[in-house]
């Protein structure tokens, strides 16, 4: 397009527009170039260019399609051309000789009736697909789609531009076909994988465990001979009773059970008689009785000879010990099982990192693959066992708190908190972000991280909407500091609770007060280094949205309306009609957005100069909508949080966190007098709950495949290789980083439970003689801070991402990884240095 006067200089008097056309079989060449002129004096279409009339009418199948509307005040002096998926007339002129274009032609006749009408091509926003994000639409509007008066080029350059547009159209066509092929391959591959896992899982039956009751004493032992299977590589022996994972250091003075597994080795060519190989397994008894504990151990099957199991007891106070024993053969070695588990875990992370499927579906696929692997090796669990693997306490906590937050949000309290936070920060964005992160870290030290994320995420989202900030960046920073603050106390994070609850560690002096004092000092140093690092990582990132708040809110409103329409299943005629009305609403909002995108151009500074004026406007707009309901919500939520504290310090309260959250949700549902319960259920993040359920099954299946046990054993071997004078420092470094990396990849709860007996055995080994408390502090720091490494490394990360996605601000795995992983590395480095100074230099053991 170019604007020229009769003297050849660019002007607004004559407007020439060229439309690139695709080739057609009946025409020669790749396309035709048509010029339409608009006289600025009388606004009548006229022939522009001497060769315009000789080129004939335009061909069908334009490479770039446009919809033509009159120019008015909403659009300004812009001319926009954009591809769409609808046919349109290629040429409009009152003097056109083409019989295909008349006054009755759609989109043309109504505009040509009035003499003073001027027409421009405008992109039709209703043809935006669901896969095309609105974040990129404004850049395309303002950049590649505007035809301005600065493009004064010759006819030769116009032909070059036409060829480039045709090449671009071909490239887009090929990319579209490639995307279709990739989509087809993805669906086909995943379907074949699921079918294969289902077949493998169904081919091998559930063997079940036959538990045999036996009684052992110092005078009587129990012996049994087992016939070996041809395809067996391992023998797994399970014992159940009043057992403990590890015993005190004085092994000879404590009651224990000794298990001997003996088998004849396969005879070699030079041996006439097979050699007997005996494996010993010592299990310590709980002197107080305690609860029923199941312990397992695998032994290598050396040959097809029968296996002999002998169990005897070393007792002092009791006369006889009742036990339950079961055994089963496995068809894969430890190394093969660990390899299978690592491949499954890597596959799950590939699905999540590259967003091939939703993270919930990725966890479900990983669980199915792990269950199929267990079935193949001969350890297929029953449905009852799989359900028992799910941590229902965590799910109950999530569900109850989601109900509380859903009702709480109806009061307008989150909007009020957002305005107050803006007022306290006096319009300074970074002061507000640091204040939010610090409050989240302090609260998570005394509350569960999941509870803190559930309470803070809606407030942060509303605050960012008020200030025209990108909520994703603020939410990621906030949840990172939530995980850091949770490591400060013994009740802030589940790994800390597991460590403090261990009876053997309590006997060593690792109680609640000592653990909290030691960890709190280390986390303070971590916070001092984390805040400057956060500012450094966000140095070149614009936290403000690139567009005005009106445009951002309108785009978000379109996204929410579209999601609402997609979630309505057309099961009845009324629901189909409602879905149609919602889609019409989406189209009307997209048209409104298209008009507003051409009338706004604003640069936003990093500090709001008019924050006092904005505060007055925001206080009028965002108020408490229901004070009665707010009073009820604050009362119930305060009581729930008080019970959380009471549960940690008062042993007489026989309610765990899940029960407290569920009871609080029931109380608030009664007080709020909720009639339409389905509205509240729609606010629950069911995808997040399913993700946690699938993740619990996946982690437990990987534990049955000996992945976590293998990591612990390799960690112990690595520590033993270090010289004795440097062993404590090496042990702290190894435990911190192994725990951090493992916790960023797998759930930190089973990893912590597995590493505690491994580290206790290291501390009791006379060849190593390491103090246990420094190892436990290193384990706690690594397990808690390692959750910041990936999106699924901590429960709070997943909860925050789920709530943000429900509000239309979901962030991907890589978006979290770009900030979370550097923060994890630096925080673990600072925590490691603190432990080295405290325990190696100062000797605080």
UniProtKB/Swiss-Prot annotation:
Residues 205-337, 382-393, 451-513, 651, 709-730, 795-820 are cytoplasmic. The chain crosses the membrane at residues 184-204, 338-358, 361-381, 394-414, 430-450, 514-534, 630-650, 652-672, 688-708, 731-751, 774-794, 821-841. It catalyses: chloride(in) = chloride(out). GO terms for molecular function: chloride channel activity. Keywords: Membrane, Transmembrane, Transmembrane helix, Transport. The keyword Iron does not apply. Its main location: membrane. Residues 26-40 have a biased composition (Low complexity). It comes from the Eukaryota. It is found in: Melanosome membrane. Belongs to the CitM (TC 2.A.11) transporter family. This is P protein.
